[in-house]
């Protein structure tokens, strides 16, 4: 599983990036997506960031990708809105 966290100042770029990520996983919080990954999906996301989105980023923008192992434990507190298990 990977977590993608982003802080993008431009509304248009941020919306486009969120729509792009939603093709691969689901939103955990406003700027955090959970993606059940394969090497191909991770490569696709990284290539898209480097080749498309980096051109639009300012010095204030960032994207952080956490590549988590299958043995990582996930604990949720509160009332999560997205409990999807299957992503197509």
Predicted feature locations:
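Alpha-helix boundary/capping detector
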Residues: 3, 34, 43, 47, ...
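Extended, hydrophobic alpha-helical segments
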Residues: 1-41
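Short linear sequence motifs
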Residues: 10, 23-26, 46, 70-72, ...
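Short, flexible coil/linker segments at or flanking structured domains
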Residues: 16, 21-25, 30, 51-56, ...
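Positively charged, polar, low-complexity stretches
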Residues: 11, 31, 37-47, 52, ...
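C-terminal structural segments of small proteins and small subunits
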Residues: 53-88
């Amino acid at each position: 599983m990977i977590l993608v966290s982003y802080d993008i100042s431009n509304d248009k770029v941020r919306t486009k990036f969120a729509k792009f990520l939603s093709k691969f996983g689901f939103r955990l919080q406003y700027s955090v997506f959970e993606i059940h990954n394969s090497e191909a999906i991770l490569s696709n996301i990284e290539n898209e960031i480097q080749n498309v989105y980096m051109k639009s980023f300012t010095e204030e923008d960032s994207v952080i990708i956490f590549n988590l192992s299958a043995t990582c434990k996930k604990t949720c507190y509160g009332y999560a809105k997205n409990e999807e298990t299957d992503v197509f």
